[in-house]
């Protein structure tokens, strides 16, 4: 089996910058140009959101993006088709950056677990992050994903106890994903001055109990915050801030240009 792109990336000694993007936001046709813009400007991994009508952990920015994506006809199947086009260089430069799909379990169950994984691998997906599927309840899912060569990522939060950090670290294929605050994504309520010390202690605790790499997300909006997170973790994830930057775009080309300019500002 060909080595997974994420597995290969995690062997490198570098700090990572991950992008989260909701397909076809804010306008239809934006996905492929945005993927190209993110790749050209140094995104190490691209997370593509799979929109769901009832997200439990998403803030207003991602909820709005998800609703618009759904209104633009985005489905799990259409996302896989877009990934396949991106990998083939159809409609954009050939995308070689690792792609991680992030979304809730219900659409995947409706699609059919093994069918979804087979189609995802065929399309060129490298990994999955399913927030509402805890590791304690996902041994079969994890085994199936690994049999297809897919990386699986699990979430750690500031209240995760040490023994569970070790479990999540063990079950995550290549890396785990740390939420920087106990809040929904993209709320803009991160008091960075007051939270820095708590986040630092939390990530030091994760470092103590995790053997694999971990990235941190939620509330990262600029170069200063990216570098702060790089001091404490192996990577930083920027999602809601990216969606906010491109939200006013009227065309796919404008969306890509806005994404490129913003991503350059983070490096």
Swiss-Prot record:
Pfam families: Trp_syntA. It comes from the Bacteria. GO terms for molecular function: tryptophan synthase activity. It is an enzyme of class 4 (lyase). Gene3D superfamilies: Aldolase class I. Pathway: Amino-acid biosynthesis; L-tryptophan biosynthesis; L-tryptophan from chorismate: step 5/5. Keywords: Amino-acid biosynthesis, Aromatic amino acid biosynthesis, Lyase, Tryptophan biosynthesis. The active site is at residues 47, 58. One of its GO terms (cellular component) is cytosol. Its EC number is 4.2.1.20. The keyword Cell membrane does not apply. It catalyses: (1S,2R)-1-C-(indol-3-yl)glycerol 3-phosphate + L-serine = D-glyceraldehyde 3-phosphate + L-tryptophan + H2O. InterPro entries: Aldolase_TIM, RibuloseP-bd_barrel, Trp_synthase_alpha_AS, Trp_synthase_suA. Belongs to the TrpA family. The alpha subunit is responsible for the aldol cleavage of indoleglycerol phosphate to indole and glyceraldehyde 3-phosphate. Tetramer of two alpha and two beta chains. This is Tryptophan synthase alpha chain. The gene is trpA.
